[in-house]
């Protein structure tokens, strides 16, 4: 049994989110939530919400026992960037790209 949760367009870069995802890949659910709860990174809060959503999906849709679940796979994909302009000297402008990512969490036995 596999249960999936996806968060599309998360407002954080994929590179920063992968640092957190690598820490919980393959861990049991309880341990993964503890790691995320005590991580000081912004990405940990976002990833924790996606993991909790996957747990809720497992309970509601599959009737699964959450004590036996673990993080089977978690991967972060780059999403479209939000493009903004900022004013520079002498009438010029520079483009700023605000990065976004897609977070996919799969739970299984």
Curated annotation (Swiss-Prot):
Keywords attached to this entry: Ribonucleoprotein, Ribosomal protein, RNA-binding, rRNA-binding
Q: Name one GO molecular function term.
A: structural constituent of ribosome
The record's Gene Ontology biological-process terms are:
translation
Protein's UniProt keywords contain RNA-binding: yes
Cellular component (GO) terms are:
cytosolic large ribosomal subunit
Gene3D superfamilies documented for this protein: Ribosomal protein L22/L17
Q: What does this protein do?
A: This protein binds specifically to 23S rRNA; its binding is stimulated by other ribosomal proteins, e.g. L4, L17, and L20. It is important during the early stages of 50S assembly. It makes multiple contacts with different domains of the 23S rRNA in the assembled 50S subunit and ribosome. The globular domain of the protein is located near the polypeptide exit tunnel on the outside of the subunit, while an extended beta-hairpin is found that lines the wall of the exit tunnel in the center of the 70S ribosome.
Quaternary structure? Part of the 50S ribosomal subunit.
For this chain, the family text in UniProt reads:
Belongs to the universal ribosomal protein uL22 family.
Which HAMAP family does this chain map to?
Ribosomal_uL22_B
Under NCBIfam families, the record lists: rplV_bact
The protein's name in its UniProt record: Large ribosomal subunit protein uL22
| Native source species | Ralstonia nicotianae (strain ATCC BAA-1114 / GMI1000) (Ralstonia solanacearum)
């Amino acid at each position: 049994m596999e249960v999936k949760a996806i968060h599309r367009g998360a407002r954080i870069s994929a590179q920063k989110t992968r640092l957190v995802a690598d820490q919980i890949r393959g861990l049991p659910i309880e341990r993964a939530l503890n790691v995320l709860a005590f991580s000081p990174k912004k990405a940990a809060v976002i990833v924790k919400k996606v993991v909790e959503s996957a747990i809720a999906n497992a309970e509601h849709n599959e009737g699964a026992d959450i004590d036996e679940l673990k993080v089977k796979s978690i991967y972060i994909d780059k999403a479209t960037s939000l493009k903004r302009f900022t004013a520079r000297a002498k009438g010029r402008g520079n483009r700023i790209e605000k990065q976004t990512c897609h977070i996919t969490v799969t739970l299984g036995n």
